[in-house]
Curated annotation (Swiss-Prot):
Binding site for substrate: 203, 218, 225, 285
Identification of the protein by name: Probable GDP-L-fucose synthase 1
Physiological role: Catalyzes the two-step NADP-dependent conversion of GDP-4-dehydro-6-deoxy-D-mannose to GDP-fucose, involving an epimerase and a reductase reaction.
Subunit organization: Homodimer.
Coiled-coil residues: none
Sequence positions that bind NADP(+): 25-31, 156, 179-182, 195
A GO molecular-function annotation: GDP-L-fucose synthase activity
Organism, scientific name: Oryza sativa subsp. japonica
Catalysis performed (reactions): GDP-beta-L-fucose + NADP(+) = GDP-4-dehydro-alpha-D-rhamnose + NADPH + H(+)
Enzyme class: oxidoreductase
Family: Belongs to the NAD(P)-dependent epimerase/dehydratase family. Fucose synthase subfamily.
Length: 328
């Protein structure tokens, strides 16, 4: 800890595997995947801190950490996240914590003088509620946000703008990536605030375990959604760190859509639930379509690799081995 390796100062990210990389938020869905990916690629100097070890909302602590560690690269995957209920109940917590984390990390990364590149991870919720489909990068700030999570979205938009401002004023190589709906190991399977895919995995597993006759899912199943395995996002993060240096944020999606009905049938098959799948069409469907336009990163040469079914099999295996076994 605290040492700086002497690697080629002109090397690309992938050629600089001894350069110190700070992954902020390494215990979450995204950060843990990035950490796994860096280690598998042979990066030997990855620095992480738990929240107990480093509270990213405390400016003085963050500045002291950067001054001591002098990382060469930063991936900012740390954020305060939660479901619709949490966002609507604690809006001040969400906007304040996320603004503090972003401001402290980006500013300390510039001031410590050692950081060559920083990547900030946002969310597809930054886009207007009625954005064109597929959603291009330039639809940012073109209309009102989805009210249910606007506090989180506004903070993430501020993060993008902060990276842009630091690039314009200081020449700091800070870039931003906006992933679509993610899933995979380390996902949140909580009954009250999990997203649709882990929620379906949990519900079908519980129905299978209790020999339930049916699983009832809200809506008609017709809305179209896009899902990206978190390992593909980790791969895209490494790709952007190595290939991209620009002002505009970059969308990262799978580019393929699936209806909620198709998704539910696939999860049912993967879990091995033998009962009926029932749709409660009296309940709302939500937005009819949500797809990111990821042509920009794909034109640079990046493509996702994990097919949805393969990713679901792996995610269900992780759920059984880590979430279910932990309850026994």
């Amino acid at each position: 800890m605290g040492t700086v390796t002497t690697a080629d100062p002109h090397a690309s990210f992938l050629a600089d595997k001894g350069g110190k990389v700070f992954v902020a938020g390494h215990r979450g869905l995204v950060g843990s995947a990035i950490l796994r990916h860096l280690v598998s690629l042979g990066f030997t100097n990855v620095v992480v801190r738990t929240h107990a070890e480093l509270d990213l909302t405390r400016q003085s602590d963050v500045e002291a950490f950067f001054a001591a560690e002098l990382p060469r690269y930063v991936v900012l995957a740390a954020a305060k996240v939660g479901g619709i209920h949490a966002n609507s109940t604690f809006p001040a917590d969400f906007i304040a914590a996320n603004l503090q984390i972003q401001t402290n990390v980006v500013d300390a990364a510039l001031k410590c003088g050692s950081v060559r590149k920083l990547l900030f991870l946002g969310s597809s919720c930054i886009y207007p509620k009625f954005a064109p489909q597929p959603i291009p990068e330039n639809s940012l700030l073109s209309g009102p946000l989805e009210p249910t999570n606007e506090w989180y979205a506004v903070a993430k938009i501020a993060g993008i703008k902060m990276c842009q401002a630091y690039r314009i004023q200081h020449g700091f190589d800070a870039i931003s990536a906006m992933p679509t709906n993610l899933y995979g190991p380390q996902d949140n399977f909580h009954p009250e605030n999990s997203h649709v895919l882990p929620a379906l995995i949990r519900r079908f597993h519980e129905a299978k375990a209790s020999n339930a006759a049916e699983v009832v899912v809200w809506g008609t199943g017709s809305p179209l959604r896009e899902f990206l395995h978190v390992d593909d996002l980790a791969d895209a993060v490494i790709f952007l760190m190595d290939h991209y240096s620009g002002l505009e944020h970059v969308n990262v999606g799978s580019g393929s859509e699936v209806t909620i009905k198709e998704l539910a049938e696939l999860v049912k098959e993967v879990v091995g639930f033998q009962g009926k799948l029932v749709w409660d069409s009296s309940k709302p469907d939500g937005t009819p379509r949500k797809l990111m336009d990821s042509s920009k990163i794909q034109e640079m040469g990046w493509k996702p690799k994990v097919p949805l079914k393969e990713g679901l099999v792996e995610t269900y295996k992780w759920y059984v081995e880590n979430v279910i076994s932990a309850k026994k």
